[in-house]
Amino acid sequence: MFTSRNPEPAVPYWRLSGVYFFVCAVLGTMLPYWMLFMESLGYSAWQTGQLTALQMVTTLIAPYVWGEVCDRASSRLRVIRAGNLAAALIFLCVFAFFEHYWALVLAVCASAFCWQGLNAQFEIITLNHLGKDPHRYGRIRLWGSFGFLSAVWLTGQIINLYSVALLPYIVAGLLFTLWLMTLVNRDQPVKEQPDGNQEQPGGIWQNPVLWLLLVVFFLVNFSHGSYYGYYSLFLKQEGISAAVTGNLWTVAVASELLMFAVMPWFMRRFSLRFILLVSLFLTAFRWLGTGMQAGNVAELTLLQLLHGVSFSAVHTVAVLLFKQCVHTAHEGKAQALYCAVCIGGGQAAGVAAGGQIWAISPVASFYFSAAVAAGAAVIAMLFLTANRLGPAGKEQQV
């Protein structure tokens, strides 16, 4: 009787994927359209901007707070369930505060504090299920990107056919569905900590690898600031139509999905360090090419294909490295730091800095992004050595 040479353990693929799908579906519903809803209530651009800024502050604080709570709790998943239920219930307050600006802002931000702040903690649940098969992470995480894309498209269709007034009902429904998805998942017992990750006397803050990872991933997210904040405007100034702009964004999302799907193949053959270095240098090339090929749709399309590298590959490697570099007692804080400092702080700072350079020269803002990404690559190459990263720096034996 024949058996698989390397049978893969059973992983609750669809239950895990469902959480990522609905987390990103909530984002895909709120990010593009919540300002339109606020405008329909009669609020000014300044007021909607205030709400956006406060939500960004929330994404900087909430992950670390929840990381501390989860690391101290007996069950990480129970905290995730409770937090997501709280997010859904708090969001219901929005319906009572349409005409009360600050109460509305408080309800939206408090809800976001719960569900967005817990995203990093579910990464640990997923990685614990994967165990010795972290290469399978991408095929679970890709459903998050698919959820975001689906929500953006479907919500836009609903708003066009009916009214933006339906938006809070859609968000509330998605939040409750997200909570239900956490109920069908289960905790996975944590495996014994490898010798290479023994808890250090000084705790998480005395870990030099953690500090290096924070710097590298902060910089690469910082380099995305001009892209996330000004890419559409950049294309418009180059005379590219809105339809073509939408197509270019779609190419990037498609590349993101594809890269998540094929990451297991790469991770079977290359070390995380090698994947990271290649991704960082290609990210720098992407931003440099974007500035140099402004107005050339064919070249810009090819460059958008690199989004799978600059986002999907980088994110996958980051999640795994932040887990591997700390003791299990600090996993929640490590993932929270990545989410808050690198993603939240890096992108926010990148948008702000990119805006300042944009005022001088739009093209220069992308050259600046290229320099930042190249700097991240050089730091990773020089200081995140194979010996320092341990198993993550060596070729995978999967």
Where are these regions (language model features)?
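Helix-loop boundary and gating motifs at the non-cytosolic
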Residues: 6-56, 209-217, 221-248
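Hydrophobic core of transmembrane alpha-helices in multi-pass small-molecule transporters
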Residues: 21, 90, 101-119, 218, ...
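Symmetry-related core transmembrane helices of the 12-TM Major Facilitator Superfamily/SLC fold
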Residues: 166-183, 365-383
